[in-house]
Amino acid sequence: MERESSELRSNADLRGAVAGEQILMLNDVRMRIAQVADLVRSNGWSSLFKEVLFLKRTAIVVEKDLSELTERSKPLASAKLKLLEIDKEMLSSGLYSFAVNSRYLKALNYLKHGCGGYALARDNVVVGDTWHYVSEAADDPRGLHEDLQRFGFSSWSKDYVYTFDIFVAPAERKGGISAAFQNSAMLALRSKGYTKAYGFYWADNIPAHWCTRVTNKWKEVRAFSVSRCLMFKRAVPLRRDQAAHKKEPSWLKNIPIGEKKGI
């Protein structure tokens, strides 16, 4: 009888584990579908193909010494926005909804993979989110985030943090909100003991360039030529002279500085 009872418990545990995996897979599928739908709805089918099929797109890897940060809360306070930490309790509380549904599904996925995040919220609606990944100090690159591996990082410090996928709802992208959100999230990470942040942006993403490099003064570490075909990516380091002429479209160079800031 005891043996039969043990076998029944084992079978029940196995069925529970399989069901849990199926739910996670279903959430991943839902996230991908919602993400594609949002992208196509906002920017058309061409934007989708641009994200999953491209050749030699320039990625700029950047770093920020978090000791250089200064408080800049006015843009968020003026827009009645606040910074919140995203964790399982926050998502499961039912107190907050996401302005863009695919970002909620992404949040579930990122938390499942051990990432941390911060939300930009007005009242109980999340209008922006940004994510980070912490690796233990290691000399084995296999323990690093896949982006860091792709960009040639071979070691890491426990005081460093990798930041990625900052998003602000289109209706909120004005008055320096995106840059202030990024700055506030970095201040929050500094308060946790991190001393340096790394990230990357695409050279053809002009708003990301102005938010990260111009307003928040992140420093360039290196540049890569990245090609992607669906799930497969390849990154090749660029020499500085190769990267320089690819960072800013020629049409933008003729726009006065004051007008660029309004992009």
Language model regions located:
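Acyl-donor-binding surface of acyltransferase catalytic domains
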Residues: 16-107, 113-115
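Conserved catalytic-core motifs of GNAT/GCN5-like acyltransferases
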Residues: 62, 219-233
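Conserved acyl-donor/pantetheine-binding loop and adjacent beta-alpha core of acyl/acetyltransferases
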Residues: 109, 113, 121, 125-161
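Conserved acetyl-CoA-binding loop-helix of GNAT-fold acetyltransferases
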Residues: 165-168, 174-188
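Residue-level recognition of the GNAT/N-acetyltransferase active site
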Residues: 169, 202
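Conserved GNAT acetyl-CoA-binding A-motif
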Residues: 190-201
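Conserved active-site alpha-helix within GNAT-family acetyltransferase domains
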Residues: 203-222
